[in-house]
Amino acid sequence: MSANIGKIVQVIGAVVDVEFPSGNLPNILSALDIKNPNNSDAPQLVCEVAQHLGDNVVRTIAMDATEGLVRGMEAVDTGKPIMVPVGKASLGRIMNVVGRPVDEMGPIKTDKYLPIHRPAPEFTEQNTKVELLETGIKVVDLLIPFPKGGKMGLFGGAGVGKTVILMEMINNIAKQHGGISVFAGVGERTREGNDLYHEMKDAGVLEKAALIYGQMNEPPGARARVALTALACAEYFRDIENQDVLLFVDNIFRFTQAGSEVSALLGRMPSAVGYQPTLGTDLGGLQERITSTVKGSITSVQAVYVPADDLTDPAPATTFSHLDGTLVLSRQIAELGIYPAVDPLDSTSRILDPNVVGPEHYSVARAVQQVLQKYKDLQDIIAILGMDELSDEDKLTVARARRIQRFLSQPFHVAETFTGTPGVYVKLEDTIKAFRGILNGDFDHLAEGDFYMVGGIETALEKYKKRQEQQ
């Protein structure tokens, strides 16, 4: 069968128009290969068909820089969407939006390829059972439990520890559950992507993860598709290898932002705040594929940037409607030196429900939140009048709240190199038992410092015993 070849008729930024012979128009979302003129390592420039303009012309979005393209150049229709390498060969590797390795470790040796555009699983294939995914991080497991096959948003500013929590989760899932992680760097800083790769390599978790990067310097076409490339990788592990997969997306906002950049070039009328009119469809198409099926699950953690801290902005507002829970990182808590700096009162989870997590877990979690909320309410009084003016009951509440606050901190495996403290994975039942004990006053004789940066309650008791012996 002879190749279907068209010719470039127009180039506007990241958008390329190609004319094909009559009756041979490529399908929407098909990939076209153009011999790469800008002398980069990649032999072809890949473009994705976005529109049929009439007169046998298609409008495409380029997945790489379009410098050096001229009218009359040949574009070959591949007849299928962008296909990316999947499976075991992709683990421990970094690839770009079209599945080419960018880690200078040679080609990805596999015969398994999947298209990046795939339908979401049918209702009949979806698993409706709600299960909790244990992460081994106390504050997450107790107060913001992760649903298996659910979607969690990670909200936080710069430098409060989003990446460290992501890495710890990748580490814990890999070691405890033997699970596989896929990391999608969507429009993030190249430096951060580089740091993540080397940190994961040093922490020994790289062999259980596939990294797919489309950084800030990439054209919008690549940034708008790189999340789908990562998703295709994750879907293979879920559907073919029957695995439970973790999909990390940093940052989901950049996916929307890239879509809005190409939207105007495609001649679409902008909607609110200049976003693409197809915002809901674009995001829905991505999010609906992230789900649990009868074969396996994809659990997703998505970092969400909130433009100008405005949660009503269309991009974060649309993202919210898809999430099962929010993990909010707070600068105030990070300033106290409590890591992970999760805000226990601002974070929410859909499955913190007695029918899912059980009455014991639910009652402990709610009691912890009540004590912390009471402490927060009393802080103004303490600041003005001091602790002595509080009633005995309030003094006890404050003492327990401060113990709880410190016990919510935890040493991480991936941070061992710079904390010098070995990381700890805490089982959920141990977490619940320990917090129940603190609430009941079983550990009122321990000092606040005994609870800081420990894993289980046994370590806190050991600290106390050591101190007693020294005295």
From Swiss-Prot:
Gene3D superfamilies: 2.40.10.170, Bovine Mitochondrial F1-atpase, Atp Synthase Beta Chain, Chain D, domain 3, P-loop containing nucleotide triphosphate hydrolases. GO terms for cellular component: plasma membrane; proton-transporting ATP synthase complex. Pfam families: ATP-synt_ab, ATP-synt_ab_N, ATP-synt_VA_C. ATP binds at residues 156-163. GO terms for molecular function: ATP binding; ATP hydrolysis activity; proton-transporting ATP synthase activity, rotational mechanism. Keywords: ATP synthesis, ATP-binding, Cell inner membrane, Cell membrane, CF(1), Hydrogen ion transport, Ion transport, Membrane, Nucleotide-binding, Translocase, Transport. It catalyses: ATP + H2O + 4 H(+)(in) = ADP + phosphate + 5 H(+)(out). Its EC number is 7.1.2.2. It is a peripheral membrane protein. InterPro entries: AAA+_ATPase (IPR003593), ATP-synt_VA_C (IPR055190), ATP_synth_F1_bsu (IPR005722), ATPase_a/bsu_AS (IPR020003), ATPase_alpha/beta_chains (IPR050053), ATPase_F1/V1/A1_a/bsu_N (IPR004100), ATPase_F1/V1/A1_a/bsu_N_sf (IPR036121), ATPase_F1/V1/A1_a/bsu_nucl-bd (IPR000194). PROSITE patterns: ATPASE_ALPHA_BETA. Its main location: membrane. It is found in: Cell inner membrane. PANTHER family: ATP SYNTHASE (PTHR15184), ATP SYNTHASE SUBUNIT BETA, MITOCHONDRIAL (PTHR15184:SF71). Belongs to the ATPase alpha/beta chains family. Produces ATP from ADP in the presence of a proton gradient across the membrane. The catalytic sites are hosted primarily by the beta subunits. HAMAP family: ATP_synth_beta_bact (MF_01347). F-type ATPases have 2 components, CF(1) - the catalytic core - and CF(0) - the membrane proton channel. CF(1) has five subunits: alpha(3), beta(3), gamma(1), delta(1), epsilon(1). CF(0) has three main subunits: a(1), b(2) and c(9-12). The alpha and beta chains form an alternating ring which encloses part of the gamma chain. CF(1) is attached to CF(0) by a central stalk formed by the gamma and epsilon chains, while a peripheral stalk is formed by the delta and b chains. This is ATP synthase subunit beta.
